[in-house]
Amino acid sequence: MWTVRPAGRLVVVDFDLERFVRAQDDGGTYEAAVAELRSGRKRGHWMWFVFPQVAGLGSSPTARAYALSGLDEARAYLAHPVLGPRLREAAQLAAAVPSGTASEVFGYPDDLKLRSSVTLFARAAGSAADDAGAAVFTAVLDRYFDGDPDPRTLDLLR
């Protein structure tokens, strides 16, 4: 459950962020993702719920199930007591991989998912009160994509 206060009115929005916690906890998936990031090579199937994208990019049932509706849901994800720290940790680990392109480390199409996810969260964190929160996501953009955000994600956020 997340509370949003647009124009001074209280609105309660249920983003069902627990779907991400359940997916990450299932079978130790998040721990496996961390181990893969530390090894410098992604092998498992966890991108959708560790590095989620904005809705409108993926067309598979899994991509749609784990898509974020926009900046408000991305901010709620960042503020979540489990998901926010995990996302930042995963982004830090991704940025710290010593060698390899995004395609070499993540494979295709997960390299595209990574770019769109960190673009979304850099924008969500950068528009919050603490702009420093975006640094971990821009570090991933710098490391793999010459600092260039994903244009399709930016278009969907407009």
Predicted regions located by residue number:
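Short helix-capping/linker segments at secondary-structure and domain boundaries
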Residues: G56-T62, R123-V136
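Short amphipathic alpha-helical segments and their helix-coil junctions
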Residues: R22-E36, A95-A102
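Hydrophobic/aromatic-rich, well-ordered segments within soluble, folded domains that form packed cores
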Residues: E36-L71
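C-terminal end-helix/capping segment
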Residues: V12, R64-R86, D148-P151
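Charged phosphate-binding loop/patch that engages nucleotide di/tri-phosphates or the phosphate backbone
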Residues: S127-R158
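Extreme N-terminal tail/first-helix region
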Residues: W2-E31
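N-terminal targeting/disorder module
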Residues: D14, R19-V21, S117, F121, ...
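Mid-chain, well-packed structural core segment of small domains
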Residues: A76-A125
